[in-house]
Structure formats: C-alpha cells, structure tokens
Amino acid sequence: PSTTSSKSPKRRAKSPRRKRTGPTVSDLILMAMSASSDRGGLSLAALKKDLKGRGYDVVRNKGRVLMAIKRLVANKSVVKAKGFYKLNKNPPTPRRRVAKRKKPKAKRAKRGRKRKAAPKKKSAKKKRKRRRRKSKSPKKARKARRAKSPRRARSPRRSKSPRKAKRRTTKTRRRAKK
C-alpha cells in the first residue's frame, strides 16, 4: 500500500509541469524559418538545430517536431521542396476564419436532432431484439462447419512429399580445364 500512495502524488506533481507557457512547436518552426536568410529554405536538420538553439528539446520531442512540420505543410503555411522547407509566400490563413456562418448552422442541426431522437430510440430497440434471436442459430451452424473442415484439409497435406533438389550441372569447371 505504501508504494501506491507514493506513485499518486508524483503523477499529480507532473501535471502542472506539462502545461507550457510560450510558443508552440509550430510557432517555433515558423519563427526559425522567418529568421533564416537561406533562400532555398531550411532542411530538417537545420530546423532541429535552430530549435535546439532556442531551448527546445528536439531529442525528446522528435515526433512532435515531425508532426508539426507535416501539419504546417498540410495547412500550406510551409512549402516542402526537395527536402527543404520554406515559408509559403501566399499563406491561406484569412479564408478559414469565418465564425459568423458556423453559429446558425449549429443551431439548426440541434433542433433537428431533438425531433429525430425519439423515433430512433424506438426503432433501435426493436432491431436489437430481432438480431439477438436470429444470431443464435447461425452461430451453431458455423461452429459445426469449422470443426469438420480442418480434418478434411489436413489429410491431403500429409500425403504431399517434399520436392527433391535437382543437381546443377557445372559448365564453368569444364571450360576452365580447356
């Protein structure tokens, strides 16, 4: 009992440490790319080196760095070309911020869900009862089939004999003697 009590406070102590105040990995990557003067962009190794210089532990968070780069490429805020990453000249960020249109759609959907919810529950109960009754008989048949089929399949396998290896004729030795 003493070991379990000692483990639980440790877990509680770690949780506040995980909350980081500061830029995210993707923000750090974007900052590194904007700061670099390389025209061709930054390689993955150069990016990691830059992040390490900014105080980010790249060795521990290797997966996070890779996922952040993939997300940035998917968002088209970063362009990948021949193993190098560049900042996109025309990032499509302003198009996505449309909060006014989303709100009325959500309200309409909620109303529709409330109306449809009651009939769905009734039909689901009926279907479940039917499924339970039907499922019992096919299971028995399947078990019987499975038991019979392996016995039949095994008998011809035993009768097969292994292939005999053919002797290779060596033409190279004969030529060497001449």
Curated annotation (Swiss-Prot):
Belongs to the histone H1/H5 family. One of its GO terms (molecular function) is DNA binding. It is found in: Nucleus; Chromosome. Male germ cells. Disulfide bonds: none annotated. Pfam families: Linker_histone (PF00538). Keywords: Chromosome, Developmental protein, Differentiation, DNA condensation, DNA-binding, Nucleosome core, Nucleus, Spermatogenesis. Replaces histones in the chromatin of sperm during the haploid phase of spermatogenesis. Compacts sperm DNA into a highly condensed, stable and inactive complex. One of its GO terms (biological process) is nucleosome assembly. Residues 8-21, 94-178 have a biased composition (Basic residues). InterPro entries: H1/H5, Histone_H1/H5_H15, WH-like_DNA-bd_sf, WH_DNA-bd_sf. It comes from Mullus surmuletus (Striped red mullet). This is Protamine-like protein. Residues 1-27, 77-178 are annotated as: Disordered. Residues 21-89 form the H15 domain. It comes from the Eukaryota. One of its GO terms (cellular component) is nucleus.
